[in-house]
Amino acid sequence: MGLLSVDLLITLQILPGFFSNCLFLALYDSVVLVKHVLLQLNRSKSSHGQWRRMLTPEGLRCVWNSFLLDAYKQVKLGGDAPNSNVIHVTDKNSSSGKPGTPCHLLDFASSERPLVVNFGSATUPPFISQLPAFSKMVEEFSAVADFLLVYIDEAHPSDGWAAPGISSYEVKKHRNQEDRCAAANKLLEQYSLPPQCQVVADCMDNNTNAAYGVSFERVCIVQRQKIVYLGGKGPFFYNLQEVRQWLELTFGKKAESGQTGTEK
């Protein structure tokens, strides 16, 4: 099968999901518009904010590119985990490197323990909303598993496809590696993670994003350098509950550090 035929086949596979996402964005904009008009009619103070549409040319490009990333990703369930280039953001007293030091994703994987890798950015609402659940998971299972947060390209930068609603802070597009690491540090200032979770940033070539088909957010589990769990494409199929279920089935529900330590 020629390259053109492969690209055409992938495009045909992408189209249904792409159009369903566009329909969702159109419905979302319609609901927000009606709410905005009603608030204006009621002269509510909350109606004075700027109304941001989601179904925009920039939004369509981002959604389409997200499906392309997912379609062309290197990672496969049961396959080898890509050893992508990343940059240290936190040290956490680790001997593997200091903040700002280049490293590889699999540097954080041990020989036997599973490595839970959570990909996302501060401007991705589903990722942010599940950070507390992720932190709790780290605390409960850090005795039997390792955890890594990979900060990627912004999902909704303030100078790009900005998300509607009031955000605790805004982040612009990353112009260099310093911008990306600064955004990751800003996230950690507001959402403190347990010290057992390491934090790295994707390089500016977005090689990790491309290899794992992240785009907005994704989660996977690496064990013995193989992908033993591969979460769905975000935002609609980003599900930390499935990760918890995998850990519970593998290690049991009583995997907290204290309990595991006493049982040993």
From Swiss-Prot:
It comes from the Eukaryota. It catalyses: 3,3',5-triiodo-L-thyronine + iodide + A + H(+) = L-thyroxine + AH2; 3,3'-diiodo-L-thyronine + iodide + A + H(+) = 3,3',5'-triiodo-L-thyronine + AH2; 3'-iodo-L-thyronine + iodide + A + H(+) = 3',5'-diiodo-L-thyronine + AH2; 3,3'-diiodothyronamine + iodide + A + H(+) = 3,3',5'-triiodothyronamine + AH2. The active site is at 124. It holds the Pfam family T4_deiodinase. The chain crosses the membrane at residues 8-28. One of its GO terms (biological process) is hormone biosynthetic process. Its main location: endoplasmic reticulum. Predominantly monomer. Can form homodimers but homodimerization is not essential for enzyme activity. Belongs to the iodothyronine deiodinase family. Plays a crucial role in the metabolism of thyroid hormones (TH) and has specific roles in TH activation and inactivation by deiodination. Catalyzes the deiodination of L-thyroxine (T4) to 3,5,3'-triiodothyronine (T3) and 3',5'-diiodothyronine (3',5'-T2) to 3'-monoiodothyronine (3'-T1) via outer-ring deiodination (ORD). Catalyzes the deiodination of 3,3',5'-triiodothyronine (rT3) to 3,3'-diiodothyronine (3,3'-T2) via ORD. Catalyzes the phenolic ring deiodinations of 3,3',5'-triiodothyronamine and 3',5'- diiodothyronamine. This is Type II iodothyronine deiodinase. It comes from Aquarana catesbeiana (American bullfrog).
